Every structure is written in structure tokens, then in C-alpha cells.
Amino acid sequence: DELYESKIVYRTKGFEDLVRTFCMNPKGVVVNENTNGIVTVNGHSYEDENKHTENTNFALLVAKHFSEPFKDSNGYGESIARLSNMLGGGVIVQDMIGKNLSELDIPTLSATPGDLSLVMPKRILDGIIEMIYALDKIAPGTANDDTLLYGVEVKFYNMQVEIDNNLETRNKG
């Protein structure tokens, strides 16, 4: 039997951040996504076998909860995505060891070879790399030299919704 999508959560050693797999796409492709004029990376699989690839792609999301007085986590994520757009004209791709890539190395997405450490905060990128090596222990080959890292994918979540005593929000409708 084949397992289509694994949900794996890892706690990093240094900061105890939670890193999780998201949106696994066996035989999938990496694609650009445009949200409010910001180009980010995403992925999907096709049902049509003619569109299958030899690759599996998935996102690794690092959960970050900020302390007071910080209130704009969506703005923080958006600024990281905008920095990727500024440095790479959109999505940046690098291999696991950070060497320069050729066009032949980039299989399914038009992306700019670059250095994600110039875009992502160290703590977040370290968590992603640590998770990849942890995944390699249960899925050998995950941390190979031909593993490509695309960035950035940002998910925007509102962690709290204000409700009244009737469990209703201020938004009517």
C-alpha cells in the first residue's frame, strides 16, 4: 500500500520550535502562487498520469508565536516573502548545500538560483534544515545533494478570533 500524505511534526533541538510537513505531493510539481502581488511557492499533484514527475514536493512550515507587544505576524511573513521577491524576482531555489544551481537542476518551476539564508531568519531556516535531516532518517534520500529548497511559502493564519458572549464575531453575515 502507498501512503499519499504524511503529517509529520518535529520539535527542533535548539529553540524547540515546531516544524511540520504540509501539502505533500507525490509525483508533484512546484508552482508559483501570486497573493496580493507577492510571488510565493506552492505545489500540487495532478491526477493525470501524463503530468506526473519523479519528484515529491512538500512544504515545511515553522510555527512561530510572538510575544507581546508584537501583533503583526501576517506582516512579518509577508515581509519575508517580499524580500524573496526583491532578491530573486520571485521564488528563490537552492540545493541542500547551498551551491549555485544551473538551469538543468531546476525541474518544475521557473525560480532564481540563490541563497535562502539571505531571505529567511536564521532560526526558521535552521529549523527547516534540521527537519530535513530528521526526515532523512525515516525517509532516506530526503537530505540528498539533489534536494532542492524553494522559498518562500508563507501561510497566513489568524490565531485568535474575537467573539462576544454569544460566540459571535463583530462581522455580521
Predicted regions and their residues:
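Residues forming the flavin
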Residues: 1-173
